[in-house]
Amino acid sequence: MRLCDRDIEAWLDNGKLGIDPRPPVERINGATVDVRLGNQFRTFRGHTAAFIDLSGPKAEVSAALDRVMSDEIVLPEGDAFFLHPGELALAVTLESVTLPDDLVGWLDGRSSLARLGLMVHVTAHRIDPGWQGRIVLEFYNSGKLPLALRPGMLIGALSFEPLSGPAARPYNSRQDAKYKGQQGAVASRIDKD
C-alpha cells in the first residue's frame, strides 16, 4: 500500500523520509511528491563506437562507455537543455532523496510531458530501500519536436511504499552499490556488474 499525502508529510516531519530541499505542501498531492529537474546532464556522443558488447570483458565495456558518454554538462541558471527527437540523455532531480530501510520509492513521469513525447525514465523507476542521493532521469524524446528542458521545472512524481519489514540488504549498506550517494548525472556503470 502506497503512502498517501498525509503519511508522506508525517514521514518527512519525523525524519524517516528525507527530501532535500523539502517540497512545499502544494507539491505533495494524493499519493505523490512532485520533483524538479536539476541542472546536470549527460549525453551520448554520436557514433564513437560501432556497438557496446554489454556482456564482453569488463575493461572493454568500460572503455566503450568512456568513448560514448559525454562529460557532465552543468547548465547555468536560466539556460535550457534541448532534447531532440530520438535522443537519450541522463539528468538528475534537483531534490536529493533519502529512504529508510523499510520504504521503496517509485518515480513516474508527468502525463503532460509524456503527451509531448518525453519519457522521464526509460525503465529504471524503482528507488531502493536505503537509497540516498539524487535520482537519475533517463530522458528519451519520442516526439517529433525538440524539447527545451529547464532546471527547476516539474519533471516527475515520487510515490512511496512501505515494506513488510526493514530490508536485510538496503542499498546504502551494500558494498556493490554502484550509485551510492550519487549527486550528479552518473553514467551507466554496467561494467561494475
From Swiss-Prot:
Domain of life: Bacteria
Pfam families: DCD (PF22769)
Protein's pathway: Pyrimidine metabolism; dUMP biosynthesis; dUMP from dCTP (dUTP route): step 1/2
Positions of region (Disordered): 169-193
Keyword Nucleotide-binding included in the entry's annotation: yes
Catalytic residues in the record: E138 (proton donor/acceptor)
GO molecular function, one term: nucleotide binding
This protein's UniProt keywords: Hydrolase, Nucleotide metabolism, Nucleotide-binding
E.C. code: 3.5.4.13
Catalytic activity: dCTP + H2O + H(+) = dUTP + NH4(+)
Gene3D superfamilies: 2.70.40.10
Keyword Nucleotide-binding: yes
Residues that, per the record, bind dCTP: R110, S111, S112, L113, A114, R115, D128, V136, L137, E138, Y171, K178, Q182
Enzyme superclass (EC): hydrolase
Transmembrane regions listed in the UniProt entry: none
Family the entry assigns: Belongs to the dCTP deaminase family.
PANTHER family reported for this sequence: DCTP DEAMINASE
Function: Catalyzes the deamination of dCTP to dUTP.
Record-given protein name: dCTP deaminase
Gene: dcd
